[in-house]
Curated annotation (Swiss-Prot):
Glycosylation sites noted in the Swiss-Prot or TrEMBL record: N60, N74, N205, N496, N788, N797
Matching SUPFAM superfamilies: Family A G protein-coupled receptor-like, L domain-like
Top-level taxonomic group: Eukaryota
PROSITE patterns on file: G_PROTEIN_RECEP_F1_2, LRR
The LRRNT domain, residue ranges: 32-61
Stretches forming LRR repeats: 41-61, 62-85, 86-109, 111-133, 134-157, 159-181, 182-205, 207-229, 230-253, 254-276, 278-300, 302-324, 325-347, 348-372, 374-393, 394-417, 418-441, 598-619
This protein's record includes keyword Thylakoid: no
Descriptive protein name: Leucine-rich repeat-containing G-protein coupled receptor 5
Membrane-spanning residues: 559-579, 590-610, 635-655, 679-699, 719-739, 764-784, 799-819
Extracellular-facing ranges: 23-558, 611-634, 700-718, 785-798
Gene3D superfamilies: Rhodopsin 7-helix transmembrane proteins (1.20.1070.10), Ribonuclease Inhibitor (3.80.10.10)
Signal peptide: 1-22
Amino acid sequence: MDTSKTSFFLFSVLCSLQLVGAARPGKQQRSCPTPCECEQEGMLVRVDCSDRALTSLPRNLSIFTSYLDLSMNNITNLPSNVMHNLHFLEELRLAGNDLTYIPKGAFAGLGSLKVLMLQNNLLRQVPSEALHNLRSLQSLRLDANHISYVPPSSFNGLFSLRHLWLDDNSLTEIPVRALESLSALQAMTLALNKIHHIPDYAFRNLSSLVVLHLHNNRIYSLGKKCFDGLHSLETLDLNYNNLDEFPAAIKTLKNLKELGFHSNNIKSIPEQAFIGNPSLITIHFYDNPIQHVGRSAFQHLPELRTLILNGASQITEFPDLTGTTSLESLTLTGAQLVYLPSAVCTQLPNLQVLDLSYNHIKDLPSFSGCQRLQKIDLRHNEVYEIRSTTFQQLVGLRSLDLAWNKIAVIHPNSFSSLPSLIKLDLSSNHLTSFPVTGLHGLTHLKLTGNSALQDLIPSEHFPKLRVMEMPYAYQCCAFAVCDNLKHSGQMNKDENSSADDFYRKDIGLLHLQDDRDFEDFLLDFEEDVKVLHSVQCTPSAGPFKPCDHLFGSWLTRTGVWLIVLLSFVCNALVIATVFRPLSYVPSIKLLIGLIAIMNTLMGLSSGVLATVDALTFGNFAQYGAWWESGVGCQITGFLSVFAAETSIFLLTVAALERGFSIKCTTKFETKSSFINVKLSIVFCFLLSIVIAVSPLLSGSTYGTSPLCFPLLFGDPSSMGFMVALVLLNSLCFLVMTIAYTKLYCSLEKGELENIWDCSMVKHIALLLFTNCILYCPVAFLSFSSLLNLTFISPEVNKSILLLIIPLPACLNPLLYILFNPHFKEDIGSLKNGDILWSRSRQTSLASVSSEDAEKQSCDSTQALVTFANSSISYDLPATSSSSSYQMTNNYKLSAVAFVPCH
């Protein structure tokens, strides 16, 4: 009664003053404090003094102030009766100041105050005396302070209080006595405190409370009757606490609609756990170490719309959902489910979203009874077969995710009755074929990770397809990706990553916990006409994943064939002359012969690629997947790496052998044993085998590209392998260069011409120079890729792989044939049937006639070196007794004839 009289009195005064204000306009505007901003609302004034660095309340506030914002200042105290004349003030904001204490009477006279904000201050307890008799107060914010104590009389007289914030403080218990007087309270948050226990009848007088937040505390136990009296409670948040047991006290909350107790330590959900909560709409209890769930736990919840159970790793049985007929979204991930009951759709006729990912489901029932299903997520399970009835007549299904299963069999009509399906993910399965019936409406298709799925997919079955991921780039050729690449170049990664966002359209079906995939399939087809005619397909085709020809140009094709033919012919001649029957092979010739064999293998690997290019000419996409994933490509890649590495290693041994040989000769020392050279050769072969096999043992293969060779860019493992090879080979070339530089520097001018077999020294030097020059582009591109320098086009990389790398296979034998006099001698001996090194068998060859020497020497002189009482410096075996050599181990000559250098 008194309140009505007071309100009538204030209304009368307001009307009178309004008439006065109408006669004297602008009066109130002039009374606005200097640092503040004021706004007229009829007779009343809104004053904004926020973030003005104030240390006290501004003066000259209008008595008609209805809104006063003093937040984000430096106010440290509020004197008593400082606002006693602000009878019309309805909202007062003091947040973000330095208030540590509010005295009694600080809010005296604020009979109309409805909203009081005191958050983000330094209060250590609720200012109980200051709050007394704020009868109109409806919202009180005390959050983000340091409050650890709430006096029992804190809220006395706050009969109209509807909302109370006490979160983010230091409370250790529920302020039971202080809350007893708040019978009109509708929403309260005590979150982000240090509360350990909720006692019985903690909220017994809060019969009007609708929302209660207790999350992010340290609650480990609940009284069995702690929620008694909360007859109107609809939302209860117990998330992020330390609860060990299911909160059985909720059984008294008959009107509860939203319940959250996720991220606790609850291990079990008992039978009929929610029997007293028939109004529940949403339950969140994921991220609990749940080991057991009663089969009847979720029965008879007719209003339940969403059920989320993530991370319940010990659940092995699908819950019985009898009576929970309104469920629209069911998420049960990270459990141990092995099967689904056949009656799942009978119990859930209104189900729209089903997420059973990360389980162990092996067999799927028929979902034909779930006519409202729009999204099914079954990724990361163990499903083997999709039958024709599994998804039959799901006319509303728009997204189906079956990735990371073991699906090997899909019935041809499995998707024939899914007219609304626009997103299908079957990536990382064991598919060998893919049915296309009924998928004409697809816009997103993912088949990547099915290595056995090598057939091309006809594009005419997917007229609306916009985004696709295939096992092989060649399968993108059918969707004109090659043609697009010719005009637009390689697609930008940022554009690819945002392409899905361009198509997304949220139709607001449900608020899901994870809407990343759900929104991805909801497309707007009418936004841009240009987008309708483009297909984003990955992995994209290109020079290393060609659609038409393995070799991109006729220049490359002709060059490869020329290298192959020359390597076969020239290396065959070198091998025939070096390894002639009944002839002794010295160490340096043995190395040259082995290098020729390796060069032949390199030519063979290039010949295989050239043959594949010829056989698949103009239609490589049809056979590309079969070729690069087959054994033939693996063998070709192995041979190319093995041959290339062995050639470099043998060339390194040859360079070192020449250096040691010259050193022994010039110092009249006995040569090192031939056994050391043989051991080095064996080591080279073993090291090359290890290098060539390592891509297979490390999990990667040579089939990353149809060239069957590790790429200089792209896949990190392949690029890392190539960079390691380049570093190793560069080290070999460095060792060879140092050895030969040291060799030439140690010899006096003209001394090399007097050394036996100096032609071999010069030949190895020529090989070193040629191979080093040819290897520079490979090293440069490898390090460019490592540094992400992309100024070199993939076409150039491809040409280097096809032409530069195998080029030594034909140049090495050509250099030997054209410039080494040993070849002329050996080919003549081979032609006439003579035995190699016949001069070493005849003791009469103490000297060579001047006429013969003149024919063989470019300077018409004979190079002779006399070794007095020293062993002959040929590379004969240490214990040779074969009659084919016709000489003894320590056979001595007074003078020896030598093959000239020129």
